[in-house]
Amino acid sequence: MANFRLNVLAYSVMLGLTAGVAYAAQPTNQPTNQPTNQNSNVSEQLEQINVSGSTENSDTKTPPKIAETVKTAKTLEREQANNIKDIVKYETGVTVVEAGRFGQSGFAIRGVDENRVAINIDGLRQAETLSSQGFKELFEGYGNFNNTRNGAEIETLKEVNITKGANSIKSGSGSLGGSVIYKTKDARDYLLNKDYYVSYKKGYATENNQSFNTLTLAGRYKKFDALVVTTRRNGHELENYDYKNADSLTQGKKREKADPYKIEQDSTLLKLSFNPTENHRFTLAADLYEHRSRGQDLSYTLKYQRSGNETPEVESRHTNDKTKRRNISFSYENFSQTPFWDTLKLTYSDQRIKTRARTDEYCDAGVTHCQGTENPTGLKLTNGKITRRNGTDLQFKEKGTAADGTKTYDFDTFIDTNNQEIVGKLNLGYANDTWYDCSLFDCKDGTKMKVFEGNATYGYIGKWRESELETEVLNGRKFARIKDRKDKNNRDNRKIKSILPSSPGYLERLWQERDLDTNTQQLNLDLTKDFKTWRVEHNLQYGSSYNTTMKRMVNRAGYDATDVQWWAKRTLGKSHNFFTGQDIVETCATTSSSAWNAFLCPRVDPEFSYLLPIKTKEKSVYLFDNVVITDYLSFDLGYRYDNIHYQPKYKHGVTPKLPDDIVKGLFIPLPDKPNSNQVKENVQQNIDYIAKQNKKYKAHSYSFASTIDPTSFLRLQLKYSKGFRAPTSDEMYFTFKHPDFTILPNTNLKPEIAKTKEIAFTLHNDDWGFISTSLFKTNYRDFIDLVHKGTRKFKVGKPGSEGEIEFDTFQNINRDSAVVKGIEINSKVFLGKMAKFMDGFNLSYKYTYQKGRMDGNIPMNAIQPKTMVYGLGYDHPSQKFGFNFYTTHVASKNPEDTYDIYAKDKNQTDTSIKWRSKSYTILDLIGYVQPIKNLTIRAGVYNLTNRKYITWDSARSIRSFGTSNVIDQSTGQGINRFYAPGRNYKMSVQFEF
């Protein structure tokens, strides 16, 4: 109730401040919807760039468009945005999806997220996640795939357009809950009044210890102009609350400190343009982006646990992830007015996106503390001979004197240089199996090696023996063995043994690298035409697009060794063929032991994949018309047609192979008692069966919006729009076969559909500001979901000795529908009209409340809790300094508004998610000062009161199963790892000329 009173109070204050607007100027209708691929003539375009480079909807006195927010470069600079999460920090109803070690993965808007919110950069759709629930069930909880949507470098962006609600007119497939559209900068943004521009910007943020440097160069020479924006960022993991005091030694799911990662990001934007005449413009552009993250998954639940340095470490999990995007484009613009267009733009783009997850399992505790290289006795090589750590001869515990007067020793008890006895830490190896590498050991003629001669073939009691070495060349290298390794009957002398450290002498490294590649070639034609029919104005935008996208997965894995020590085995040796009586020199190709020797026989497995490579062809045409009937009435009419064709492109022997076991016998049964060749043939037949299932989709999208200005201070906006999302290739074609979890492909899926209805009331005045209230409702249908299809019997076992067992089968189908309703308030009031001393001050308020349910009264987890943002801002009249003070309040996530999809599997009657976000209020203070014309200093304090809180998006990223992003579900230990940073700071300095 307190929150409700607060909302009413805020609304009343804003309403009162905007009430005296009866004498405002005549209104002008603004289009409520515009496609992303829009152009205008040269003068209009330059004017638009000028405006967008300095202001945005919420900064101007123009009322906002319905369900649309524009963030410009100036706003992003003012808010000190460093990543996509910062873009929507002070927006309500839009958040960023958290993806653990991989960072962020797209946006959540109006109850849906990731692939159901479109993301475009310069008209190009960005990489989509593998959204098949089957794939997520199998792989996502284990950190093996970088299954995220790629981001963008903030410093290269001219504008970010955020649309809430269905709107495929702008973005095509994927815009169910909304869209986020990025536009990159252009040289013309900076060269309005001069022929050059230079900027250097350096910043730092304490939340992740990130520093960044950005250099911007723009210039014009005769008919050419160019732009270069290059940015480099270096930082580490986001520091959760109480990061500096958290225990850094705890490992596993109970770890409370964020896992350590080194994060780097490089971005370069290049644009070169040629204007042969004022009506023609050619542009060649390159947008290069790479995000890298390297570190350790210390919260990984399968991490080998040790209590301290008293026990050697076996291995730990290291990560080396990467997201790389490269877009090369060429565009031609024509500004000659013709009966068919006022502006024309033709663009060809070649975009390649790679998201990579790499993990390396190896010990990094140092040679002394790693099990593979431990040498507690301190044995070393001194001038080619084995000695103690100080170079003296080896010593063992004396046991007595033999009958011949020689001393006997306990060769299991080593005497260190400090006279400490070390028991059981040496390896006494059979002399016949011990090969000394002559590049390390002294193998000269007559050289003798001190070895152990036991009293028996077993045990550790024996005496010293000096034996000559016998050299031999194996595979081009010289090795030596003890000459006395044979007895008088030429049998192995099991009493003679070598003395070496007990560890293998190298560290094993098991690595795997998994790539998701999305390569797109796209051709766009965009035209605009302004004309009148009678007294009705038309602002027409139309065009078409054609693109091909190849999406594939490539998995690599291998096994090798690092930190090789002097005692490591350097050869596989020889084996004796009893049939021929000959010794055979072993190689990695002939010995069975190679599978266990990472140093001598490292391996790289053949490339494989869990997905068929899919080529997608998309064709689309769109038409958008802003129809201005009078100064008081206008309409926006939009239509788009999409044709999408999926074609699997699998070539046997060329394409990375699908594992045999996940497809054999799946659709085409195995013959009775098949041999290995028949199994191989059956695998190919089943892959061919899936690969021949091409699929086509056709989609019609539309949008209708009306803007009515009954008075000079009141605006009414209505909107009705339809969006769609075609099934992704993995949702249709992903196949997996296992007794517990078999996934069948389904090429009969229908597109997901969203329809949005929205109405907005706005009070506005050029001098006072605006307050806008909107009500919305979005209906979703044909959500794609994974369902259990029953059991089927499949043959299992070795060829020729199979049996049949039942497999649980699952398949994606169109099932769920959903409804999301809500209310939003957006307002900004300029206080200068109230009193002269308040000139430059402004108040703002944003509020979003939404509620949604799927069929069966199931809550939608992607809906954010009730959120409000209060703002107080000031700008000096000459822009010498200014500040913004934001108060963000987020309500608790109620248990009845959450749904645990695994509750049934866990035999829980309570289907709510156990660990949720509580209500919190955050204060941020941001300011800037311009002491001289060419210098701007910005600084900010975030979470001013050092509040401990967790966002709902972080809380819902906690997985109830798997090995990554998990906590102790019973006690909650480990959840602090997901908390937001405490009080933190940002600062940047920018020089402009």
From Swiss-Prot:
Native source species: Haemophilus influenzae
Sequence repeats mapped onto the chain: 26-29, 30-33, 34-37
Membrane topology, from the record: Multi-pass membrane protein
GO CC terms: cell outer membrane
Region described as 3 X 4 AA tandem repeats of Q-P-T-N: 26-37
Lineage: Bacteria, Pseudomonadati, Pseudomonadota, Gammaproteobacteria, Pasteurellales
Keyword presence, Glycoprotein: no
Domain TBDR beta-barrel as annotated: residue spans: 193-993
Protein's name in the database: Hemoglobin-binding protein C
